[in-house]
């Protein structure tokens, strides 16, 4: 008869493994959750793998155990648990209780002892036992009907390694019970079990394989045949330290007689997905686990189903639906093409909790156009819908995805299921789980209607309503028009430059082969590292797991003394330019010879726009080769490019927000701010500031905006860390209110876990209290910079809205074609140049009133490079 199976889990061990194996996660409230998330994934994986219905979890109690009485220094060398991990222990225990899972804990004993006791008890009761732990100490429990399962999580993926007695012997060369003696000899630094001084794993294994126990080994330690290979003193070491070995054995032995028992039937894996557990899963935003909890939900609690919806094919019924919508002057709307129906466009209309329609656009264009003339409507991902049917521009349509983005800009998705979970407390199937395109449209219209009130209220509660209404929403049609217009490319010039690059790459390749004395794959870091640091014996080689590091910072230090390195860096530059720009850009040129990229409004945490397909914001500008690529972007015939760029916008904002009198005065006098800073920081008269001092001051000025450290500045300027530290200190002495302002932003972040821009945009900082120094320091730097960078993003977005509006009012044919952070590029009809230039400069400079005025530099050219 097949034995029933039970899963016994080492709670702290698996939580810890998961914490270090899963990238850091937190929910919108800043609660760290990666350990819990990883634990649950391991739990579900083990349950499926073992096909069991019985589970229990053991935890350590944060109090001394019997082992501490034996040896007060037990585990004394362990570092304290990181705060982010410690926080997750009670949260996980709360969740497991709500999942009706037995939690096993007892003062004076470790989880290992409880697991050992219960495992042996269950085996004696005729059960098959699987003990899940990240601790190999439990291998001693392995038995005929007790399997030890050790999961290892890396990069979010979990692999499970299983051990019955034969597996333990195969890997360690000893039986499970002998594993205790092995540890007694070699010790365990993680638990501060001393072992026999100087005795490593190989020596200990030889001894236990031959003598089976430390007691037997001790009895034969002086025998002539007690000859451990390459360790002649092993017998003597054991004799002299036998008391230590015995103590170590006692510490390493799992106590299987803990006064605890477990009722097998209490461990039944059922009703774990109930309203209480699901509430925590939603709160912690474990999106990928929602469906698992929903599927397991009891029949009394069903997954939300869509209200009955009508697939309208009758023109008369379509008119009735739109008549109802027009009467209430409000609806959830979503427009979508159905690829399974030849790309046919459908309108999804939600009028209430119970009235939901799918109507072919061809059946209701007139009605929809009429509907949009009055009232307000709600949708998701509005810009994508503009591309399907431009007439949507005529209506007052609110994009709730944008609102959700402002409320939590750290998320990577603002689809219907995200909004349902966050603002309706509903779990909906994700896009990949849907049966057809219609369901996505129906859910999107339904969620748009249902989530609107809560999203709008939260925008008001967080003082971001004006930002949403006056900046983000009006920007959507502007970005649509930019995408639709695209930017013209001289494809012939682009391909010609690509051919030139290929020739240079081929020539450099031959030169590198010649210098190396053989052919190899220059693009392979492993092969390149072998050539440079083994064959050619170049200094400074940093060995990694996969070979030598050939990162840019490593090679740049060698290029002056070793010509081959300079050629390699040049080769890499040309190769990247060719693949990313020459070939990459040409793939995006459409039949109209224009690139129609995408501008993403809901990607960055600071509010900056992001350019994709292709990324036109990162085309190099400071190199000659980068400028050549900019030159292939040209205006249409009869037009020119007008480029407007804010001058030092972030430094001007720093001066304005900090209210530092010296900085403000320098800008008001139109002084060279870098020369002024050099004079202040290096204590030299203004007229004696050298180009080098100005360069260093410039690095300090821009570095301060980004919360630069002494180390970062020293690396950037190739100076000592002490010098860099002094530069920063002198800067803050010269501009004390800047220091006061930046410290104030960090203090605000510590109190509120977010910072905000001048326009109220919030940048959450969930790791501002992280125990990990690197993560905490990064959050502090973001706290200093995000209000400045975010305000700059808000300013140019608002300027874009004004410029677009003014161009429309003046009936101009000119248009914005690109936004590159602090820069706008317009394709301007020559006859409109002066008018458009005035509109552009005025809008950008007067978008907000600040102590330090915003200054815009505008230039004209026949290609993008000329215009910049």
Please tell me what each predicted stretch does.
Residues 2-4, 25-27, 76-257:
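Extended two-metal-dependent nuclease catalytic cores across DNA- and RNA-processing enzymes
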Residues 6-7, 11, 17-56, 72-73, ...:
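Conserved RNase H-like, two-metal-ion catalytic cores of nucleic-acid enzymes
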Residues 155-159, 165-183, 307, 341-461, ...:
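Active-site-proximal helix-loop-helix substrate-binding element of RNase H-like nuclease domains
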Residues 241-363, 376, 441-621, 634, ...:
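Conserved "right-hand" nucleotidyltransferase catalytic core of DNA-directed polymerases
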Residues 350-353, 401-430, 442-447, 601-685:
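Function-dense linear segments that define catalytic or interfacial modules
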Residues 459-471, 475, 795, 799-820, ...:
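Active-site palm subdomain of RNA-directed nucleic acid polymerases
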Residues 484, 596-597, 601-604, 679-812, ...:
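Conserved catalytic core of nucleic-acid polymerases
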Residues 506-510, 514-565, 733-781, 785, ...:
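C-terminal polymerase-core module
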